[in-house]
Design a protein with these regions (language model features):
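Conserved catalytic or regulatory cores that recognize and/or transform ribose-phosphate-containing ligands
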Residues: 1-146
Length: 146
């Protein structure tokens, strides 16, 4: 007699989202230099009927929460883990901007490792495209870009 396999946490979450009839959840990824573009992407995704989660802190802008270097380092680690949780929660990722740095590249790899679809506002910077060496070395200018 065979026993049913227990659900993985991912399967349980997917089932719960379906039973709750939740809209698709999109996580916005990208360099915090693109916070304004992330806000625009949030607006567009929300208007399209999707739930949006995105970075909530721009540590490149001065703020009392990260003015102490030691505290800032610990906060950055917590925020990175929080963003990975947002990626796990989401149904898909949207990468904003025409530049992919190390952190964003790691987020893309993590989302793909989890089997999440990944969209780009600037597909030319997709690190999954064979032979594309333009990411991570600076901004990429595209006709569809800024």
């Amino acid at each position: 007699m065979s026993h049913p396999q227990p659900l993985t946490p991912e399967q349980a979450l997917a089932g719960a989202k379906k039973r709750l009839e939740l809209p698709r959840i999109v996580v916005i990824c990208g360099s915090t230099r693109f916070m304004a573009e992330m806000a625009e992407a949030d607006l567009r995704e929300t208007a399209a009927g999707r739930i949006v989660v995105k970075p909530g802190c721009d540590m490149k802008s001065p703020h009392a929460l990260w003015s102490d270097p030691a505290g800032a380092e610990a906060l950055k680690a917590r925020l990175d883990e929080l963003h990975r949780a947002k990626i796990r929660l989401a149904d898909e990722a949207l990468v904003v901007g025409d530049y992919i740095g190390d952190s964003t590249r790691a987020e893309i790899a993590y989302a793909r490792e989890l089997g999440k679809p990944v969209r780009f506002t600037h597909p030319v910077v997709d690190p999954g495209v064979a032979g594309d060496r333009r990411h991570g070395d600076g901004p990429v200018t595209t006709r569809a870009g800024r």
